[in-house]
Structures are given as C-alpha cells and as structure tokens.
C-alpha cells in the first residue's frame, strides 16, 4: 500500500559540511513528486535521506524527522535495512547485477529477504516484470544475463527488481538521464502506471519531464554559494510551471540560471 511521507526540519551532513538545511514537506501517496533545481543544490542528497541511504556515505548523518504514515524512519529502534525494503530506489544508471540472469536479477531481493518459497518465485518474477512493462520482451530469455538488455530494458529490469519486494514508496534518481528518447518515453509511461500502486519521488534535471510525469514539483536551490541547499517552493506541478509563488522558481524554470 502506498504511503504518505511527512518530512520536518530535515538537514543532512557530510561530516561537518551541511548539504541541505531545514527541509519540510509532505509527499502524497499514489502520486508522483518531482524534485528540480540546479546541480549541487541537494536534490539527490535529500532523496537518499528518505530511505536512509545517506547514512551509507562515510560521514553521512541526518537531523530532523521523516515520517512514513506516522512512523519515524530515524527512530533508534528502526532498522535501516527494513526501511530500504519499504522505500525502494532506482538509480541514475541502470545497474542490473552483471553476473545474474534476468530472472535472478528480479528474484535477488526476494531470496535475500527469504520472504517467498521457491515455488512462488516464478509468479512473483513474472508479476514484477509485467509491472515494469518488460515481460513480453524478455519472457523467452529469462535465463540470459540482464546485462545483455538494452539500456532502457535494463532500467525497467531494475524497476522490476525494486517493485518485486513490494515497497510502498519508489525513489527514482534521474532514471532517464542515461537513456535515449524512446527508452525515456517508455519509463515515463511506466511511472504513470506505477503511481497507481506506489508513492513515487523522482529527481530530474529535465524540467519538461517533471512537467509531464509529476503531480507535484519541489524546487530546490542553494541559499548562496557555499551554503546548504534548501527547499524553495513545492506546489502542484501545473502551478509551479505556470505561476510559481517565488521569483527564484520562475527564474530557474525560464532558464535565467541553472
């Protein structure tokens, strides 16, 4: 079941360096929220705080709260591994496990969790590949290496792998930046279908993509050179692109900087 995310007063650090500062927002369930802003403003850092991946970076730490349907993901008794099962992630470049078959790529998380019997794996793998709009393209070569697929197919394989463990939230960090236009369109169409089942957050440098796929858009920017990134504005996507409330948002969208 898709879940709502409430973030309050969140700051993230790399050692003594504060990367983002005092971010508060709500991400609605069964919707797509896009993060836009210039390079280095903390979009991807913030995205990684939502499933505690930021802590994997040496010196990475977080202050503030991230509530997933009222459960604080940063409570001391919450296991980060459990968080990452609940909040899945798709990275910028397709990263199928190179030595694994297509089938094993999708089944990897299920086997790691030990949550399915071997007899159930076939059905779950097929369901996940269908959910990623990839089944018809690979059903006759499931035992072939996932690395042999095209770039767009590899990214959809990674999405299938992410949704196989049934997360409630799906984070996407520039999922189309390494893909050609046709593959990008396939991923964008897939995002529109997946939001019926998941809460989706996407980081993108492509403002046209944000306008096409998202329901709400958040604009991030640096407070000043050398200062932490901050959330400048979040609103319905149509409003952000047609009548933003903050001048800096309009300047960025119109290409005056960034």
Curated annotation (Swiss-Prot):
InterPro entries: AAA+_ATPase, ABC_transporter-like_ATP-bd, ABC_transporter-like_CS, P-loop_NTPase, PstB-like
Listed GO biological process terms: phosphate ion transmembrane transport
One GO cellular component term: plasma membrane
UniProt-listed PROSITE patterns: ABC_TRANSPORTER_1, ABC_TRANSPORTER_2, PSTB
GO molecular function per UniProt: ATP binding; ATP hydrolysis activity; ATPase-coupled phosphate ion transmembrane transporter activity
Entry EC no(s): 7.3.2.1
Keywords: ATP-binding, Cell membrane, Membrane, Nucleotide-binding, Phosphate transport, Translocase, Transport
Gene3D superfamilies in UniProt: P-loop containing nucleotide triphosphate hydrolases (3.40.50.300)
Catalytic activity: phosphate(out) + ATP + H2O = ADP + 2 phosphate(in) + H(+)
Residues in ABC transporter domain copies: 5-247
SUPFAM superfamilies found in the cross-reference section: P-loop containing nucleoside triphosphate hydrolases
Bilayer topology annotation: Peripheral membrane protein
Subcellular location: Cell membrane
Keyword Membrane (UniProt): yes
Entry keyword annotation includes Membrane: yes
Amino-acid positions noted as binding ATP in the UniProt annotation, renumbered to this chain: 37-44
Summary of the function given for this chain in its UniProt record: Part of the ABC transporter complex PstSACB involved in phosphate import. Responsible for energy coupling to the transport system.
NCBIfam families named among the record's database cross-references: 3a0107s01c2
Assembly mode: The complex is composed of two ATP-binding proteins (PstB), two transmembrane proteins (PstC and PstA) and a solute-binding protein (PstS).
Similarity field: Belongs to the ABC transporter superfamily. Phosphate importer (TC 3.A.1.7) family.
Protein name, per record: Phosphate import ATP-binding protein PstB
Species in which this protein is naturally found: Streptomyces griseus
Gene this chain is encoded by: pstB
